[in-house]
Amino acid sequence: MVVIRLARGGSKKRPFFNIVATDSRNRRDGRFIERVGFYNPLAGEGEEGLRIVQDRLTYWEGVGAQLSPTVARLVKQGAKKAAA
């Protein structure tokens, strides 16, 4: 099953997450099919904290990919931010 979830990057104490489409059997930071966006929880005022390529996310959902709970929350947050 394909899932869209976070893959951790960054250094120690400085997390950075890629939003990726991957097979659910792969490791968290392992092989992935496609990078759909990123999330930077420590983004400053002038930095972009969240970017999701919406058309690719829609494609993956259309072919049956499941969103992880955290990614679903981030998508909702990103949609609210885009509407504002």
Curated annotation (Swiss-Prot):
One GO MF term on file is: structural constituent of ribosome
Q: Which Pfam families match?
A: Ribosomal_S16
Any one GO CC term of this protein is: small ribosomal subunit
Q: Which UniProt keywords apply?
A: Ribonucleoprotein, Ribosomal protein
Which InterPro entries does UniProt cross-reference here?
Answer: Ribosomal_bS16, Ribosomal_bS16_dom_sf
Please give the biological process terms from Gene Ontology that the record holds: translation
Q: Which family does it belong to?
A: Belongs to the bacterial ribosomal protein bS16 family.
> Cross-referenced HAMAP family, in alphabetical order?
Ribosomal_bS16
Record's protein name = Small ribosomal subunit protein bS16
Q: Which organism is it from?
A: Ralstonia pickettii (strain 12J)
Q: Could you read off the lineage of the organism from its UniProt record?
A: Bacteria, Pseudomonadati, Pseudomonadota, Betaproteobacteria, Burkholderiales
Please name the gene that encodes this protein. rpsP
